[in-house]
């Protein structure tokens, strides 16, 4: 894991330079014209890549901003790059202008003072963000304080092939019971892939009688006792997994391919609309559907953040603001595009803009907001950093 320990040594102050102010938006858009934004974002999904390419087309049309998608397999790689530039004294015109980020990676960059801002709450489209109803001002319990801007809402769902697994499974105990009776028919991406670690934290939240302790940082005094139910569960589950737990798909799309190939019947997703989009793109069978656990599932927001040493901060803010626009949000929510949840307040946008959202059909495999039920809070990032490391020591295999 490329995470937190090395940040403690970073004590040198960042060079203070004149920065574009989002409070003067005409000046920001004027400065942004002609700039290029290198957006470091996960590149493991063709639908996501296509959406980012569309964003690039739109911001070039409207603002003269060029958007380059730098495809990542691990967001921590971008964090490490900014850190390396900081250590080398490269405090201007860094290689990265914007990062798709949340959780422990955001926490690490924020603590190490590697982010530009605060900017998010001064962007024009912040006025239509649903601050009251969505978790857009905290990230895995860490206050964002304007250092990242939201662009999508996500919630854990489980995708199942109803031909072989017709009924939803209500909790982790039911998943274990089913997997034991149907060995080889379930798997999850190998941590530290974000979906793999998502399965681990969802399991822990579901197994604990009182998961509220996960809102606090993990400590040496609490960690072993709190995570004991998870390891007991995984010790029983692992031998029942696809390939007896001796191999794992590397990514979420690779996991879905196993359903498409008929090798497994159950997968985890962090996008309620992913199954519908995959069916529309012939990446999942028509029999695929989704469910959530009876006690609810984890939900969070996806954010973008701007490194402190970006040379295109104005253009990066333009892209961040466009991502929060009703146009971009409606496209992202379209189940044939991404199927992501919106960060917007439907009462704050115009009737014409709302009509676009109202016209979207959820699709055959997408649950309604009522069916998605209660959203469980993300654990503090410190839990998942330790759990992912421990998982590698206990169950990790070479890819």
Each predicted region: which residue ranges?
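Mature extracytoplasmic/periplasmic domains
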Residues: 297-298, 302-371
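A ligand-binding cleft/hinge motif common to bilobed small-molecule-binding domains
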Residues: 106-108, 267-285
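Periplasmic-binding protein-like
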Residues: 154, 233-238, 284-305
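Short, low-complexity disordered leader/linker segments with a strong preference
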Residues: 1-33, 399
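Short, polar/charged alpha-helical segment
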Residues: 22-33, 40, 45-66, 158
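Conserved C-terminal helix/tail region of periplasmic/extracytoplasmic solute-binding proteins
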Residues: 20-23, 257, 364-399
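Hydrophobic residues within well-ordered alpha-helices
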Residues: 82, 109, 255-260, 306
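Extracytoplasmic ligand-binding site segments that recognize negatively charged/polar headgroups
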Residues: 42-54, 70-77, 92-96, 100-253
């Amino acid at each position: 894991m490329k995470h937190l320990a090395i940040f403690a040594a970073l004590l040198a102050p960042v060079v203070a330079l004149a920065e574009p102010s989002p409070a003067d938006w005409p000046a920001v858009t004027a400065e942004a014209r002609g700039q290029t934004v290198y957006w470091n974002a996960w590149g493991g999904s063709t639908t996501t890549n296509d959406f980012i390419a569309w964003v690039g087309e739109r911001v070039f049309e409207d603002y003269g901003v060029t958007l380059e998608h730098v495809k990542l397999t691990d967001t921590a790689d971008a964090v490490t790059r900014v850190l390396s530039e900081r250590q080398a004294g490269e405090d201007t015109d860094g290689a990265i202008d914007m990062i798709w980020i949340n959780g422990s990676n955001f926490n690490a960059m924020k603590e190490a003072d590697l982010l530009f801002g605060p900017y998010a709450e001064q962007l024009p489209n912040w006025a239509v963000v649903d601050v009251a109803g969505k978790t857009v001002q905290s990230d895995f319990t860490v206050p964002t304080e304007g250092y990242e801007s939201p662009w999508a809402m996500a919630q854990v769902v489980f995708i199942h092939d109803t031909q072989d697994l017709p009924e939803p499974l209500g909790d982790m105990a039911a998943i274990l019971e089913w997997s034991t009776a149907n060995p080889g028919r379930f798997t999850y991406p190998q941590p530290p892939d974000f979906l793999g670690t998502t399965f681990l934290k969802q399991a822990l939240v579901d197994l604990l009688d009182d998961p509220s302790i996960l809102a606090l940082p993990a400590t040496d005094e609490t960690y072993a006792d709190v995570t004991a139910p998870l390891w007991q569960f995984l010790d029983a589950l692992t031998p029942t997994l696809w390939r007896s737990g001796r191999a794992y798909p590397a990514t979420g799309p690779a996991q879905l391919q196993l359903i498409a190939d008929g090798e497994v019947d159950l997968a985890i997703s962090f996008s309620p609309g992913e199954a519908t989009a995959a069916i529309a793109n012939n990446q999942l069978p028509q029999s695929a559907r989704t469910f959530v656990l009876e006690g609810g599932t984890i939900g969070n927001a996806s954010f973008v953040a701007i490194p402190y040493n970006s040379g295109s901060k104005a253009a990066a803010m333009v892209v961040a603001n466009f991502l929060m626009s009703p146009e971009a949000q409606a496209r992202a929510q379209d189940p044939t595009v991404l199927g992501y949840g919106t960060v917007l307040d439907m009462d704050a946008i115009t009737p014409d803009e709302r009509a676009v959202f109202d016209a979207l059909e959820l699709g055959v495999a997408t649950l309604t907001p009522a069916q998605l039920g209660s959203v469980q809070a993300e654990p503090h990032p410190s839990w998942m950093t330790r759990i992912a490391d421990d998982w590698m020591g206990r169950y990790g295999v070479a890819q």
